[in-house]
Regions:
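Gram-negative bacterial Sec-dependent N-terminal signal peptides
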Residues: 1-22
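Proteolytic maturation boundary segments
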Residues: 23-61, 241, 247-314, 318-319, ...
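M16 family metallopeptidases and their MPP-like homologs
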Residues: 60-62, 67-84, 90-92, 109-158, ...
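Metal-associated gating/positioning segment near the N- to mid-region
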Residues: 86, 98-106
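Peptidyl-prolyl cis-trans isomerase
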Residues: 114, 164-165, 169-170, 452-456, ...
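A common structural junction motif
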Residues: 156-165, 258-266, 381-390, 635-642, ...
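Hydrophobic, small-residue-rich alpha-helical packing segments that form membrane-like cores
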Residues: 161, 168-237, 241-243, 248-256, ...
Length: 802
């Protein structure tokens, strides 16, 4: 569980309710799909086979080519914590554990070793989760070998009705579940529960968290587990999904063989979600948790959830509001970068909460001293959009991004991964939605998107925020006895402030061009690996590895000699500050916001990061935008913006970062352990809050600017491209920059093998928290990662511990 947030729907995929890993289809296919949906019902993915066994179990089979020789299984059981009574709160989740601990075909302790013998790892290949209204078992099967297939389905069948639920096994698991309860317990989790109790009053959600209660975890008798298991784990409440490198006939045979013998049931249980109590007046609520990371303010409208059938009309009905929130969030994103903005971040959106409530929300994160100004800022920005709407430039940018996302989804659909498909099909089944392809999604929505007007978006946003009373909530780590009254006063005062129409920024053209193209001066082919290595005339090395398993997706990394070990010795944490400067600063001639407008509709972007030895500039693109991506990445290499934008956001966040670390066990480890292990070497210790705050942009420029322009560099490109096509593009971009060093600098021995503590001690570390949580860490001193064979063996050893 994560802290409660109502996130807006920013990605274009949100306009298309089905899963969209992506795919390839021509214009005529889209038109054909559009005709087929004229009747009003979305067309199911034609490769998906849906059926039902005589016993009532529903199954879905989806042949899929990637990854080859593998398949994925999802067993979804239509039950979760909402089906629990007071005396069994947590049994749904507890059962999820128990099915691994003794079943028809596996005595307690036998299942996991049997899985490992066939190459299935718990956590990686096999996992499960419990939610309010479902329990889902997942297995990604690494082989089509008969013994592996048999094991996978035997286990899944045992999950379905073969759990032994032995009393000794239940008692042994109680401590593990208690530990998980404590791991989940956090300031954010506690704040979320208080927010839910306000927002979802009347529903059963605030009283039915999947982890349950400690009393039930520690004392629930075996008969409670058995009764729940036999009541809800029945064929009519199950959906089985198989997706992978299989034929429909294989899938059907497996379903019948392993699940056909389950007995038909007469399930009559009705899940009670309760009835949302809608607000009858505007209310204000102050929530205090002294260990909360930050202060957050939100304005929320909750309405009872209305189940809508999955029709073309209903899918399209949501588009104007989703686009309105996307444009509103772009405004908020731009605002946050201004030095005088009172908030760190803000966003708005609509979310359905477990089919119990539909919530529209706008929320912000801020420093405590700025909460009133932050609340006023989001209230007025929302009201500005409702009163004056959006302009054509904003809509054009949003439309370009939606169109690009849809087209990219279509292009890459052919190489969608089976594990993603299996999970998406299971979730479509859970929501009673038609599982559709990206081609179908775009056929449904394209006309609406292309003809959408600013006025339609404005009207949708206005409708969302009209006819209901908001709940205004502030959560903080500060006590405020008059908090609710102060919230209401600040909110009412903000409502009286006049707002003006939004002024859009003018769009610019991309400024950067490079010199004369470079040339390839050396070329090496490693045919067994399918790798081409180039040396360009300016010294840049290039590694090219075309692949076919991710259609129309290309990854590009510039690795420049330097990295964390090149940092000034005493500048602990400067790499954190540098990441903010480089990722938030845009280019010399363009801010990040300008680049977002310039590149709207293109699949391009650059992220800065670093390893111990290299500065990295990384991006992902497609064939159509490949040259633009290389131009952009080269511009980041040679002309970083070093703007204040990223620094402004980081400085606002620093107090929250350290407050969180002060009150969490992971923070205590991060702040204290490196100093112990590396004898207070500032290269490896976490910076103090004062030190991180003191850094300036000049410190970053002095560190990284010259290396980015001059140091040895390797360019690595992997993905769906042709080697001969990309070489001229490389020559015109990264090959056109000035000459660089032809080899990495030699690393000083004190950096290669820093002095470490003697590993013959134990130490207790403390941190300030009211939450009872302890972490035990063991450290072994090993050689560095330069010996690849040893590093792999150590990784295998590490895997053995899990």
């Amino acid at each position: 569980m994560k802290a409660f947030t109502i996130t807006s729907i920013l990605a274009a995929a949100c306009l298309f309710p089905s899963y969209s890993p992506a795919g390839a289809a021509a214009e005529n296919k889209i038109q054909a799909a559009s005709m087929q949906t004229a009747a009003g019902i979305p067309k199911q993915d034609p490769q998906l086979i849906k059926g039902k066994l005589a016993n009532g179990l529903t199954y879905f089979i989806r042949p899929n080519a990637e990854p080859k020789g593998r398949f994925s299984i999802r067993l979804r059981v239509n039950t979760g914590s909402l089906n629990e009574t007071d005396d069994i709160q947590g049994v749904s989740h507890f059962l999820e554990h128990m099915v691994f601990n003794g079943s028809t075909h596996f005595k307690r302790g036998e299942m996991i070793p049997a899985m490992q013998k066939e190459g299935l790892g718990l956590g990686g290949d096999a996992n499960a989760y419990t939610a309010f209204d479902e329990t889902v078992y997942m297995m990604d099967v690494p082989s089509m070998k008969e013994s592996t297939v048999d094991l996978a389905f035997t286990i899944m069948r045992d999950f379905a009705d073969g759990a032994l639920l032995e009393e000794s096994a239940i008692d042994a698991e109680r401590g593990i579940i208690t530990s998980e309860y404590k791991v989940r317990d956090s300031a954010g989790y506690r704040v979320m529960k208080e927010v839910f109790s306000i927002m979802l009053d009347g529903t059963r959600i605030p009283d039915r968290y999947p982890i349950g209660t400690l009393e039930v975890i520690r004392t629930a008798p075996r008969e409670k587990f058995i009764n729940y298991y036999r009541t809800h784990y029945v064929p009519s409440q199950m959906q089985l999904v198989i997706a992978g490198d299989i034929t429909p006939e294989q899938g059907k045979a497996w379903v019948e063989k392993y699940f056909g013998s389950m007995k038909k049931d007469n399930y009559s249980f009705q899940t009670d979600r309760g009835t949302l109590k809608t607000a009858t007046e505007t209310t204000a609520h102050w929530i205090t948790n002294k260990e909360a990371t930050s202060t957050e303010a939100s304005i929320n409208i909750a309405r009872p959830y209305v189940n809508k059938p999955d029709t073309v009309a209903n899918r399209n009905k949501d588009i104007p509001l989703n686009v309105a929130y996307a444009m509103l969030n772009r405004r908020l994103e731009k605002m946050a970068k201004n030095a005088d903005c009172p908030f760190i971040s803000a966003e708005g959106g609509r979310a359905d909460i477990v089919e119990a409530a539909e919530v529209d929300s706008i929320q912000t994160q801020a420093d405590y001293k700025n909460w009133k100004a932050a609340l006023a800022a989001i209230e007025q920005e929302l009201r500005r959009a409702i009163e004056f709407g959006f302009n054509k430039e904003e809509l054009a940018e949003a439309r370009s991004n939606i169109t690009a996302a849809a087209e990219n989804a279509i292009k890459s659909w052919a190489t969608a991964k089976s594990e993603d498909l299996a999970s998406a099909i299971a979730q479509s089944a859970a929501r009673d939605k038609v599982f559709t392809t990206p081609q179908e999604d775009w056929a449904i929505s394209r006309e609406v998107v292309e003809n959408l007007t600013p006025e339609q978006c404005q009207a949708a946003l206005k409708e969302a925020w009209t006819g209901a009373f908001p709940r205004v909530i502030v959560t903080s780590n500060k006590e405020n006895s008059q908090g609710s009254a102060e919230i209401m006063k600040a909110y009412r005062e903000s409502q009286t402030a006049k707002v003006q129409p939004y002024q859009a920024d003018g769009r610019k053209d991309f400024s950067y061009k490079f010199g004369d193209p470079g040339k390839v001066t050396a070329r090496t082919e490693t045919t067994d690996l399918g790798v081409t290595q180039l040396t360009l005339s300016n010294g840049v090395r290039v590694n090219l590895k075309p692949t076919e398993f991710d259609k129309d997706s290309i990854n590009i990394t510039f690795a420049v000699d330097g990295g964390e070990l090149s940092r000034p010795e005493k500048a602990s944490g400067l790499e954190l500050f540098a990441n903010a400067v480089m990722n938030g600063g845009g280019l010399k001639d363009h801010s990040n916001d300008e680049l977002a407008a310039i590149m709207a509709g293109k699949k391009v972007g650059v992220g800065f990061s670093m390893t111990d030895r290299f500065f990295l500039l990384s991006g992902n693109t497609n064939r159509e935008d490949l040259e633009t991506q290389l131009q952009l990445q080269t511009a980041y290499l040679m002309h970083p913006g070093y703007r204040q934008d990223g620094v402004t956001l980081l400085r606002r966040a620093i107090p929250m970062i350290y407050n969180k670390m002060d009150h969490e066990v992971q923070g205590a480890m991060k702040k204290q352990v490196p100093a112990i292990l590396y004898r207070n070497n500032p290269r490896f210790t976490f910076p103090t809050q004062e030190q991180l705050t003191s850094y300036q942009i000049k410190d970053v420029r002095d560190w990284v600017d010259a290396p980015l322009k001059n140091n040895y560099m390797e360019v690595t490109v992997t993905g769906d491209f042709r080697t001969e096509d990309i070489i001229p593009l490389l020559e015109r971009t990264v090959g056109a920059v000035p000459k660089r060093a032809e080899a990495p600098a030699t690393l000083d021995e004190t950096l290669r093998h820093p002095a470490m503590a003697d590993f013959n001690f134990s130490k207790d570390l403390t941190y300030d928290s009211s939450i009872d949580k302890t972490m035990v860490c063991l450290f072994w001193k090993t050689p560095g990662g330069e010996n690849k064979k040893l590093a792999r063996r150590l990784n295998m050893l590490k895997a053995g511990f899990y």
